Amino acid sequence: PPPHIRSHPVRARLRRMVQEATNSDAWGPHGQLLSKLADASVEGGEAHAQIVGVLGRRIDHARAHPEKWRNAYKSLLVIEYLTKHGSPRFVDEMRSRRYLSVLETLSKHFEFVDPKDLKDHGISVRNRAKSLVLLLRSSERIKEERGVARKNAGKYSSYSSRDAARDGQHWSPRRPERASHWDAEAAGAEGGAGAPQFGPKC
């Protein structure tokens, strides 16, 4: 079928994948799903826009409705994974002022205490966002983490809630991506691109 017919089911499938990875279930997104999202981000274009759009809407919705804190927390997990494993364009986008300001706001101001058991879930989101901001602000750390990801690309492990607590130390296999400045130490090349914004608020 023509591209304009094929593109709709592809967009819908990608949206479902990101929604599944950032849902409200008590366990983290599994490694195979994260690896598929990383592969899709490398395709660029519409795939990239769909991934960033759903992540943005999840975070915006959780900011407006803090009881959806798991959606925000798991969106941060996905952003971290794609920073380490996804496209160079995704990294450049997340490092832009637009996205860093959103993540910094989460790291400082996200609040939610469960009224049922008085457990503070806001601190989990703040700490995860703070960790992600530190990663995104460090070019050297990003290059180092992406180098580790390349070396471990043949290993497989599910990304469980325990993995999430350890910042995820095992990665799913994926195909090689085009080299960029973020992978310069491994590949000696330059690349990257810039950035649309997070999707509209829910």
What do the PLM-derived regions correspond to, one by one?
Residues 1-202:
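Alpha-helical scaffold domains
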